[in-house]
């Protein structure tokens, strides 16, 4: 299951504009207008309109890293990942590394979305080197490590993500997070640990058929056939077609006929 990018637009210009008014007052005023409109449209999830306003803001004043960062975020939402990478790199050049950790994280997510996992890990690692306490960046690198089978590294990243997620980001540790954490432990043969994470995932979202299926497999590995069967049936009831087919097959007959 894919993690979502949790990086938000950077703050507006109200704290910084006084530094520039003497030289580029007219252009910056026009820039500010479109910048604010872009941010508003982004927050309203009107991404095509946000992109148009960000483009106009950059045309009016092209030396503000914040604007390129926000346009990069718009590009992410629109699936324009190559354009997003270009904007985030420009933002870092113009911002004197002010936002470099977050921008490296955003670049990493764009590479991840393009299937360039090596590029994603390199940029997540750069972000972590600058700010090692960004929970969502550790989470992102952990997911990529999981995808390419680096389960030891993924485990380390997920454990650190849990330590460093801020209170405002705890919502990101959703059912998908705990399912993936369980999957990592399962692949490392830590079945009891995996069972614990799947239990948390199901508490977060008791309607997720995949987590029930994964927990069923773990319970079976641990010798709890009745518990496994209960989860297989629950997964099927929630719409898992694979488990439905299995229950109706010769191999799944034992579970289908079990009274629970």
Regions found by a protein language model. Give the residues of each.
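Alpha-helical tetratricopeptide repeat
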Residues: 2-260
